[in-house]
Curated annotation (Swiss-Prot):
<dbReference type="GO" id="GO:0050480">
    <property type="term" value="F:imidazolonepropionase activity"/>
</dbReference>
<comment type="function">
    <text>Catalyzes the hydrolytic cleavage of the carbon-nitrogen bond in imidazolone-5-propanoate to yield N-formimidoyl-L-glutamate. It is the third step in the universal histidine degradation pathway.</text>
</comment>
<keyword id="KW-0378">Hydrolase</keyword>
<feature type="binding site">
    <location>
        <position position="318"/>
    </location>
    <ligand>
        <name>Fe(3+)</name>
    </ligand>
</feature>
<feature type="binding site">
    <location>
        <position position="322"/>
    </location>
    <ligand>
        <name>N-formimidoyl-L-glutamate</name>
    </ligand>
</feature>
<dbReference type="GO" id="GO:0008270">
    <property type="term" value="F:zinc ion binding"/>
</dbReference>
<feature type="binding site">
    <location>
        <position position="73"/>
    </location>
    <ligand>
        <name>Fe(3+)</name>
    </ligand>
</feature>
<keyword id="KW-0862">Zinc</keyword>
<feature type="binding site">
    <location>
        <position position="145"/>
    </location>
    <ligand>
        <name>4-imidazolone-5-propanoate</name>
    </ligand>
</feature>
<dbReference type="GO" id="GO:0019556">
    <property type="term" value="P:L-histidine catabolic process to glutamate and formamide"/>
</dbReference>
<feature type="binding site">
    <location>
        <position position="243"/>
    </location>
    <ligand>
        <name>Fe(3+)</name>
    </ligand>
</feature>
<feature type="binding site">
    <location>
        <position position="145"/>
    </location>
    <ligand>
        <name>N-formimidoyl-L-glutamate</name>
    </ligand>
</feature>
<dbReference type="InterPro" id="IPR005920">
    <property type="entry name" value="HutI"/>
</dbReference>
<comment type="pathway">
    <text>Amino-acid degradation; L-histidine degradation into L-glutamate; N-formimidoyl-L-glutamate from L-histidine: step 3/3.</text>
</comment>
<feature type="binding site">
    <location>
        <position position="246"/>
    </location>
    <ligand>
        <name>4-imidazolone-5-propanoate</name>
    </ligand>
</feature>
<keyword id="KW-0369">Histidine metabolism</keyword>
<keyword id="KW-0408">Iron</keyword>
Length: 408
């Protein structure tokens, strides 16, 4: 066989639903790569003969290979920090109190408007490096810290540039409807007009976004405003997604399902009717335990209902300066299990196959299947459950991206 590389002495957590074992596991396995794609995988005993003198062979020392991790919800590009608000919350202030006092998102908006692209790029690069060291091979990055046309475009340009200069694939999301900027404090409908009539066309003209998101909440955008933005995005041919049911149940998830959104994110206050709507539309539920933890929330997402209705559950970091300043997908695996009672297999599926579904890229990444992109990680673990069980010592040994060894 003519391959570019072969990995032996490994176990595979394929996350392929067609493999009946937990995690889609194949033990005592091998995997071969050709032209950036998975060319063969299976039990080592069935590995076809190949020229060991001309093809690089990597020995996994009994470790586990999983698909590359996918962080499907981040706000990774921002300037400044909000440590002062952390102190205020510990003294009793709520997330809503801080937001209504022009803190929260608005304070980060001010910092991002002042920062130039070079500064934002370097900050983003450092954060992307941190995720990459934990086995992340694809990441979604949202705008939303500009709230004016110039700064929203600036953030999205930086995200696109990161994708060009880093081995991690970057998917971009336009989140101009993240908060009401001070200039439109008493005219939120006017700001929605600006998003639809000026911001969105400018984003599309530069091909800066793969999707559009809205924060549908009582401190942000109502249902009517949310539908206007998402409908405009959908009409322009962009994927849509939604922050919804984080602080209250406004019915955003049902709206997102009706419009065919790829995902609804947060969903702590989602009810059974909303879960049923997601199930019927095939919309993913993105769980963000980092924000739940950092904001010290008590209302948990309806995990049992999501299971009952077969809604794909995704785990993501929600890395951002205000509600989840936690740049770690491995910690999300642990939090998803300890805080939300996911099984370790559900958690890993949420950072691989289901995360790919939330971004609309499941045909190419998210599981180890012949013909898919060769994005995978070798972990120094005895069982896949260890990835969720223990945190603090990074077990990621090797990362292959598009068939190339990028981290060793």
């Amino acid at each position: 066989m003519s391959w570019d590389q072969v990995w032996i002495d490994v176990n595979l957590a394929t996350m392929d639903p067609s493999v009946s074992a937990p995690y889609g596991a194949i033990t005592n396995a091998a995997i071969a790569v050709k032209d950036g794609k998975i060319a063969w995988l299976g039990p080592r005993s069935e590995l076809p003969a190949f020229d060991v003198l001309s093809i690089p062979v990597y020995r996994g020392k009994g470790g586990w290979i999983t698909p590359g991790l996918i962080d499907a919800h981040t706000h990774l590009i921002f300037a400044g920090n909000r440590a002062n608000e952390f102190e205020l919350r510990l003294q009793g202030a709520s997330y809503e109190d801080i937001a209504r006092a022009d803190g929260g998102i608005i304070s980060t908006v001010k910092a991002c408007r002042e920062a130039d692209e070079a500064e934002l790029f370097e900050l983003g690069r450092q954060r992307l490096n941190a995720l990459a060291k934990e086995g992340v091979t694809t990441v979604e990055i949202k705008s939303g810290y500009g709230l004016d046309t110039e700064t929203e475009l600036k953030i999205l340009r930086v995200a696109r540039e990161l994708g060009k200069h880093h081995h991690v694939d970057v998917k971009t999301t336009f989140l101009g409807a993240h908060a009401i900027p001070p200039e439109y404090k008493d005219n939120s409908d006017g700001y929605v007009d600006l998003i639809i009539n000026k911001m969105l066309p400018a984003v599309i003209a530069e091909n800066l976004a793969d999707a559009v998101d809205v924060f549908c909440e009582n401190i942000a955008f109502n249902l009517e405003q949310t539908e206007r933005v998402l409908s405009a995005a959908k009409a322009a041919g962009l994927e849509i997604k939604l922050h919804a049911e984080q602080l209250t149940n406004m019915g955003g998830s049902a709206l997102a399902a009706r419009l065919g959104a790829k995902s609804v994110d947060h969903i702590e206050y989602l009810d059974e009717a909303g879960v049923k709507a997601l199930s019927e539309s095939g919309t993913c539920a993105v769980l963000l335990p980092g924000a739940f933890y950092f904001l010290r929330e008590t209302q948990k997402p309806p995990i049992d209902l999501l299971r009952q209705y077969g809604v794909p559950m995704v785990l993501a970091s929600d890395f951002n300066p205000g509600s989840s300043p936690i740049c770690s997908t491995l910690l999300m695996l642990n939090m998803g299990c300890t805080l939300f009672r996911l099984t370790p297999e559900e958690a890993l599926t949420g950072l691989t196959l289901n995360a790919a579904k939330a971004l609309g890229i499941e045909d190419n990444v998210g599981s180890l299947v012949v013909g898919k992109q060769a994005d995978f990680c070798l972990w120094d673990i005895a069982t896949p459950a260890q990835l969720a069980y223990s945190y603090g010592v990074n077990p990621c040994k090797d990362v292959v991206k598009n068939g190339k060894l990028v981290h060793q």
